[in-house]
Amino acid sequence: MSRKNKALLEIAKDIGGDEAVEIVKALEKKGEATDEELAEITGIRVNTVRKILYALYDEKLADFKRIKDEETGWYYYYWHLETKRLPEIIRARKLRELERLKKMLQEETSEVYYHCGNPEHPKLTFDEAFEYGFTCPICGEILQEYDNSAVIEELKKRIEELEIELGLRPSPKKEKKKTRAKAKRKTRKK
């Protein structure tokens, strides 16, 4: 499976789950098809196929041409994948993810959280914990200050990875190579 194909299927899965993946695969194989044909090929209900096709269209991953049947007067929509802009779409999605992660990091670093210790229960901000008298609103246990340093480190790591992928930050490996090259040049000049 090509990298482009894998990225397309990942985006399809984000958009509409396994059903969207099946529709994209069917469109790749067939090239162009109506929603009814795709429903027949995949075994997915026509309404669901249409919903997914419109979601793919909204993401600019699918397009259609409308053809009128002269006998019936009905319009048929022939759908096809539109992957020319896939790199641009992937970049835009990564930028949105980066902004979301930065917002989460801001929230994690600007708040003090409290938690009862049960992983299924929510962590609460100081104000929320104060409101509940520092007892868990679900189980009644005493709330303790929540150590979110691991969460913060994971967010920082993921942000750095995305920034490197997007070319917004130089790769640490590239930095080392540049430094070594500069050191060699300085040594040669002496």
UniProtKB/Swiss-Prot annotation:
- GO BP terms: regulation of DNA-templated transcription; transcription initiation at RNA polymerase II promoter
What SMART domains does the record tag this protein with? TFIIE (SM00531)
Where do the TM regions start and end? none
One term of GO molecular function = DNA binding
Q: Which UniProt keywords apply?
A: DNA-binding, Transcription, Transcription regulation
Q: Where is the composition biased (Basic residues)?
A: 174-190
Task: Using the record's annotation, list all stretches that form the HTH TFE/IIEalpha-type domain.
Answer: 4-87
One Pfam match, given by its short name, reads TFIIE_alpha
Which Gene3D superfamilies does this chain map to? Winged helix-like DNA-binding domain superfamily/Winged helix DNA-binding domain
- At the top level, the lineage of the source is Archaea
Ranges where the record places region Disordered: 170-190
Q: Which family does it belong to?
A: Belongs to the TFE family.
Assembly notes: Monomer. Interaction with RNA polymerase subunits RpoF and RpoE is necessary for Tfe stimulatory transcription activity. Able to interact with Tbp and RNA polymerase in the absence of DNA promoter. Interacts both with the preinitiation and elongation complexes.
Its UniProt domain note says: The winged helix domain is involved in binding to DNA in the preinitiation complex.
- Name the job this protein performs: Transcription factor that plays a role in the activation of archaeal genes transcribed by RNA polymerase. Facilitates transcription initiation by enhancing TATA-box recognition by TATA-box-binding protein (Tbp), and transcription factor B (Tfb) and RNA polymerase recruitment. Not absolutely required for transcription in vitro, but particularly important in cases where Tbp or Tfb function is not optimal. It dynamically alters the nucleic acid-binding properties of RNA polymerases by stabilizing the initiation complex and destabilizing elongation complexes.
Which HAMAP family does this entry report, sorted A to Z?
TFE_arch
State the protein's name: Transcription factor E
What organism is listed for this UniProt entry?
A: Pyrococcus abyssi (strain GE5 / Orsay)
